[in-house]
């Protein structure tokens, strides 16, 4: 079953318009409200729902139904924020425009009612729009019949002002924390600020600021939601900064200084989040408003610091504009007059800072000081300063920047009188004209009172250094200021009491004798006895104010210090070793410091490296955590978006199916109705009342219609056949009757045609004669102009011919000139190209010549290097040969000496043979280095010579085999003693070559794979090495020996 018709937006809109037309606007609003807040509306297309919302907000404004409008707009935002954001902005703008229009109309109506009354601030007596009626106003309205302007505004204008305020608040609540509606949100906030400023709504402005502040605080809480704002985005942050600066401006205009200070804190918080620096024009407005706030709160120290920052910003802007590094849009326009004014205010505000302390009283608690310290830290951060400002620092900064030259003359004179050349007896006379000039300026008049406090403080501090007591009358005469800034005795006494209470002054007043006594007790407060010790005092710096003499308290307090200094100087003069010991101790300390500098530097560098690594690790961990969080957030957001997209697709698909089905049903119903109407009007003979309309469909209707049409066709054919037969008989009768009159008709027609021909012929001849006569007359009339025409034509032709010849000759001259110019250009181009080509060829030749020279030089250097290497190699070979010869001679001398020793031993005693116990042959120690070797041909020849001479050279003694001589070592170097003892029994063998290497035992014993034991007789040397033992042998692996 299809839904009821009033569910469709078009039907709802039509129904509401009908109700409005009959004067039932509340009923129309109820209908629209029910439709907008219905769940079925979520699937309605936005295009068809927008007109309904426009009419809905219009009725809400007319009837002042703010709550209903809020409900409907919330529902509409939820429906349209994912598909079409523009329609939300259109509806909300319409809502605000209608509310503002109603307020304007209400004001006009109130003006008409009370045309004789004028008010600069409408409804100024209504402090709170949400609490309009108070018991006093109700009683006044009851007992008083007078119609005043306030009562008229309260009755006519104030309700619409309240509704407009609720409109702004509702729109801001709807648009909050939505990135797609952020621009509209900021625009609405600016409109709300203008509303508060235009109608002087201070209470609503406070609530608006708190509302915006809560929205920003909740932005981080709802950052995971879809379309949440991101304060890390530079554009978003810049829009919030613009809104907060406008909030600051409105707060200052309304003189709501507390809200202005909170706006300053909001701006500072947003600036700390910003990655890009703020514009200079915005920061100039920031410091200017901050200076006004500090002046109102009588915080003159930070007021002067704000002026100092403002002046620095103006200097930077002027320098940037002069250097062309900035634009006028980003930097405030600065003139010399602006710089002079700013410099004057910087200096004047610094002079107005109280000299004595205003921070605490003498008995203040520590927690109070801590709170004030925290407050000063906050204010310092707001100014963007590294440390808290002070009076001395501000003056030093002003002097370094040359503010005295830029300031106005009276301000410069005031600085010289107060800070440079202060004289208590003539201070008031000197400063009177300056105070008059300052008091004449409305902007500088606010500094007169703090300047009086500074002057009185300096006056009493200077008098306390000179006098012990003075008359009150003398004080009153010194403290004389010009009118209207005159200081009364009561004000002076109040100032003295406040200074004594805070511990800055130590003064007693005796009203009986009229004397003012300065306290000289040496045990009194050090703060009172040391002028200028207060924070921010100009006298805290040495030499800022002339000190006349020390007070008794200072003399008593500094007695030990003076004694220590005197004793130190005396020791230096009396005992020279005292200075030497100090110098030595100083040098020792310096030496220790120098010795530990490197180590401390290395430790510092190591700590810095460790700290950097820890910072990098912490940063990496934080970045990784942030990336993971961003990834999770992105995945979650993507999942939500995909789920929302899928839900919207499903809803869209269902709506489309439903729409198609409804459209098909509607078309089917319309088709049935149309066919029924056609049956009623077109086809006769059908009684529709007998048909069941519920059971009808298109096919049955079509069959009924076709049957009826067939029936009508048959009836029509019968009628046509009967009519044709009747017409045939009539036509035959008509033709028989016509045959009688055909001849007569022919003659009459021919006579008529001849008459028409004669008339046409006569008319044609007449027209031809008239035309011929006119042409002949025209010819005779124009024949007189032919000679004149011919002459004129001839003259024009000759002039044209002469002009043509001139132009042709000029063209030929131009052509020849351009041709010659072109020839010169071509020749010059070819000459230039030829010169460039020759220069290029010359450059290539020079390049090739340079490359060839470089190659030759490289080859020469290579040849020289090879020659030097060859010479060095030859020198090394010669040195090696010399060393080999020296080693060989040394070895020969050692062998000869060994042979001589062996011969001497053999001549003295001959040891018995040791055949039974052969000595163990130890491996040869390769002590003698290999110095020079022979080639493989020489070694081969030596082997062959040794093999042939072995049988002949060996003696043939008859000895048993078991008593064969022990094997001799074939290598040179160290010879064991048992081998030396047997040298006398036989001839000494030839010295082995010095180049023979160490040979292992298992390779020396070639006859057996087992090493010789102690009970076996070692084989003879000839049997061990048949090829001679003089040549070096090559090492052969074990596996290869076994294979052989």
From Swiss-Prot:
Start and end residues of each stretch annotated as Disordered: 797-1044
GO CC annotation, single: eukaryotic translation initiation factor 3 complex, eIF3e
Coiled-coil intervals, chain numbering: 92-121, 611-907
Domain of life: Eukaryota
Keyword field: Coiled coil, Cytoplasm, Initiation factor, Protein biosynthesis, RNA-binding
Composition bias, Basic and acidic residues: 797-901
InterPro entries for the chain: EIF3A, eIF3a_PCI_TPR-like, PCI_dom
PROSITE patterns assigned to the protein according to its UniProt record, in alphabetical order: PCI
Domain PCI: 339-523
GO MF entries: mRNA binding; translation initiation factor activity
GO BP: any one term: formation of cytoplasmic translation initiation complex
Subcellular localization, as worded in the UniProt entry: Cytoplasm
Membrane-crossing residue ranges in chain numbering: none
Subunit structure: Component of the eukaryotic translation initiation factor 3 (eIF-3) complex.
Family: Belongs to the eIF-3 subunit A family.
Role, per record: RNA-binding component of the eukaryotic translation initiation factor 3 (eIF-3) complex, which is involved in protein synthesis of a specialized repertoire of mRNAs and, together with other initiation factors, stimulates binding of mRNA and methionyl-tRNAi to the 40S ribosome. The eIF-3 complex specifically targets and initiates translation of a subset of mRNAs involved in cell proliferation.
UniProt-recorded name of the protein: Eukaryotic translation initiation factor 3 subunit A
Annotated source species: Aspergillus clavatus (strain ATCC 1007 / CBS 513.65 / DSM 816 / NCTC 3887 / NRRL 1 / QM 1276 / 107)
């Amino acid at each position: 079953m299809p839904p009821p018709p009033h569910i469709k937006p078009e039907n709802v809109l039509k129904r509401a318009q009908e109700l409005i037309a009959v004067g039932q606007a509340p009923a129309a609003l109820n209908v629209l409200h029910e439709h907008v807040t219905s769940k079925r509306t979520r699937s309605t297309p936005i295009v068809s729902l927008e007109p309904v919302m426009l009419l809905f907000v219009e009725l809400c404004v007319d009837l002042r139904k703010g709550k209903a409008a809020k409900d409907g707009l919330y529902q509409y935002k939820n429906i349209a924020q994912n598909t079409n954001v523009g329609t939300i902005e259109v509806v909300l703008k319409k809502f605000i425009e209608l509310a503002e229009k109603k307020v304007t109309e209400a004001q006009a109506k109130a003006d008409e009612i009370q045309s004789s009354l004028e008010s600069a601030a409408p409804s100024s007596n209504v402090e709170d729009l949400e609490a309009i009626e108070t018991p006093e106003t109700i009683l006044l309205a009851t007992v008083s019949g007078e119609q005043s302007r306030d009562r008229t505004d309260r009755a006519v204008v104030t309700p619409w002002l309240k509704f407009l305020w609720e409109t702004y608040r509702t729109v801001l609540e709807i648009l909050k924390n939505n990135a797609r509606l952020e621009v509209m949100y900021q625009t609405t906030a600016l409109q709300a600020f203008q509303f508060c400023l235009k109608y002087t709504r201070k209470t609503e402005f406070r609530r608006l600021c708190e509302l915006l502040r809560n929205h920003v605080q909740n932005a981080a809480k709802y950052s995971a939601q879809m379309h949440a704002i991101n304060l890390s985005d530079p554009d978003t942050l810049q829009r919030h900064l613009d809104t907060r600066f406008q909030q600051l401006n409105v707060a200052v205009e309304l003189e709501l200084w507390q809200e202005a200070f909170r706006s300053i804190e909001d701006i500072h918080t947003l600036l700390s989040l910003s990655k890009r620096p703020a514009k200079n024009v915005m920061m100039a407005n920031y410091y200017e408003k901050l200076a006004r706030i500090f002046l109102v709160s009588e915080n003159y120290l930070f007021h002067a610091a704000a002026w100092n920052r403002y002046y620095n910003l103006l200097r930077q802007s002027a320098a940037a504009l002069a250097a062309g590094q900035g634009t006028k849009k980003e930097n405030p326009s600065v003139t010399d007059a602006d710089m002079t004014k700013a410099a004057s205010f910087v200096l004047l505000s610094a002079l107005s800072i109280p000299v004595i302390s205003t921070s605490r009283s003498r008995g203040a608690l520590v927690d109070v000081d801590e709170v004030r310290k925290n407050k000063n830290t906050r204010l310092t951060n707001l100014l963007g300063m590294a440390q808290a400002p002070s009076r001395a620092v501000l003056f030093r900064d002003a002097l370094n920047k040359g503010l005295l030259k830029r300031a106005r003359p009276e301000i410069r004179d005031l600085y010289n009188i107060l800070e440079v050349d202060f004289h208590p007896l003539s201070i008031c006379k000197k400063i009177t004209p300056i105070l008059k000039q300052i008091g004449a300026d409305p902007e500088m008049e606010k500094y007169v009172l703090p300047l009086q406090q500074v002057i009185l403080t300096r006056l009493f501090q200077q008098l306390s250094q000179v006098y012990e007591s003075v008359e009150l009358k003398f004080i009153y005469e010194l403290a004389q200021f010009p009118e209207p800034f005159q200081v009364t005795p009561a004000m002076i006494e109040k100032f003295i009491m406040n200074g004594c209470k805070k511990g800055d002054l130590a003064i007693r007043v005796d009203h009986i004798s009229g004397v003012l006594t300065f306290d000289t007790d040496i045990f009194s407060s050090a703060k009172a006895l040391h002028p200028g010790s207060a924070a921010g005092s100009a006298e805290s710096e040495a030499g800022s104010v002339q000190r006349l003499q020390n007070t008794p308290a200072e003399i008593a307090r500094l007695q030990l210090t003076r004694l220590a200094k005197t004793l130190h100087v005396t020791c230096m003069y009396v005992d020279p070793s005292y200075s030497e010991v100090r110098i030595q101790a100083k040098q020792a300390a310096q030496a220790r410091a120098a010795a530990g500098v490197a180590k401390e530097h290395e430790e510092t560098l190591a700590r810095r490296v460790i700290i950097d690594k820890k910072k990098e690790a912490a940063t990496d961990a934080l970045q990784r955590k942030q990336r993971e969080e961003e990834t999770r957030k992105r995945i979650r957001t993507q999942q939500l978006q995909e789920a929302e997209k899928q839900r919207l697709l499903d809803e869209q698909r269902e709506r489309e199916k439903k729409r198609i089905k409804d459209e098909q049903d509607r078309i089917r119903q319309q088709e049935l109705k149309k066919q029924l109407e056609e049956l009623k009007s077109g086809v006769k003979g059908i009684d529709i009342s007998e048909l069941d309309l519920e059971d009808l469909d298109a096919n049955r209707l079509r069959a009924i219609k076709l049957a009826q049409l067939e029936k009508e066709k048959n009836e029509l054919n019968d009628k046509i056949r009967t009519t044709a037969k009747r017409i045939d008989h009539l036509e035959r009768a008509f033709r028989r009757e016509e045959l009688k009159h055909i001849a007569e008709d022919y003659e009459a027609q021919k006579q008529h045609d001849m008459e028409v021909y004669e008339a046409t012929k006569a008319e044609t001849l007449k027209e031809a004669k008239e035309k011929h006569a006119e042409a002949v007359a025209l010819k005779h009339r124009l024949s007189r102009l032919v000679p004149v025409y011919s002459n004129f034509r001839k003259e024009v032709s000759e002039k044209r011919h002469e002009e043509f010849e001139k132009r042709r000759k000029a063209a030929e001259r131009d052509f020849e000139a351009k041709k010659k110019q072109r020839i010169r250009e071509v020749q010059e181009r070819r000459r230039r190209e030829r010169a460039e080509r020759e220069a290029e060829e010359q450059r290539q030749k020079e390049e090739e010549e340079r490359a060839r020279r470089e190659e030759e030089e490289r080859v020469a250097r290579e040849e020289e290097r090879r020659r030097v290497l060859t010479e060095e190699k030859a020198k090394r070979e010669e040195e090696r040969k010399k060393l080999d010869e020296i080693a060989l001679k040394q070895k020969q001398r050692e062998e000869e000496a060994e042979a001589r020793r062996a011969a001497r031993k053999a001549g003295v005693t001959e040891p018995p043979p040791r055949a039974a116990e052969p000595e163990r042959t130890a491996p040869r120690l390769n002590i003698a280095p290999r110095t020079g070797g022979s080639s493989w041909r020489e070694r081969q020849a030596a082997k062959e010579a040794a093999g042939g001479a072995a049988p002949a050279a060996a003696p043939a003694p008859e000895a048993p085999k078991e008593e064969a001589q022990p094997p001799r070592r074939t290598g040179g170097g160290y010879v064991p003693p048992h081998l030396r003892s047997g040298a006398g029994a036989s001839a000494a063998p030839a010295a082995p070559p010095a180049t023979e290497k160490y040979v292992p035992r298992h390779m020396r014993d070639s006859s057996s794979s087992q090493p010789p034991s102690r009970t076996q007789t070692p084989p003879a040397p000839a049997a061990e090495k048949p090829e001679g033992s003089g040549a070096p042998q090559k090492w052969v692996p074990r596996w290869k020996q076994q294979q052989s």
